């Protein structure tokens, strides 16, 4: 950990992002006061791309009433053009809206999940796609069955033009609301400078979301949600589920 810190936590990997009413000159003055004395250093290149993922299933003993499951797979990296397709897929499957596929299937129709969400996290050379569900232990087998049923729908059923447009419109709306928060905007700008070296206008992001086709969604679903490549971790009171 210390070696990683010393290698990567260097000035060339630092971005100061500010969203405020302060004049730019004041922001620079404050930054120089706190960071101006740090010696100049560059990160040492040499990270090896992640390889060797092997799907696996594990059940862990967990002495609680509620059971937990995480299902996931490796996914697109931060520079993969398919990241917009998987972001849209993720939002439809288990995003924050009440109309996500998993929320409707497990909570609205069956009432068997306390917590339910899916996540996509891209990194520099790989990515992570995951689904989390918390439910009563007796309901967990059914919850897992329903999750896989919804994943199968994404792999096998092409989205209609109207459903695709609705999903794109919803994702763009969520993005518009998120950047109304100065903190969210500040963090997004800093991350984009670190990862891409630029900050794209929100209109460009909208354009890329709108460019995702039903075929793109079908392709990324079959790649990322392939049953043979999914790993699963269960926490419950039983040794078998």
Predicted features and spans:
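His/Glu-based metal-binding/catalytic segments typifying zinc-dependent metallopeptidases
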Residues: 43-99
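Active-site palm subdomain of RNA-directed nucleic acid polymerases
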Residues: 101, 106
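Charge-rich, well-structured scaffold segments of protease-associated domains
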Residues: 1-43, 69, 76, 94-96, ...
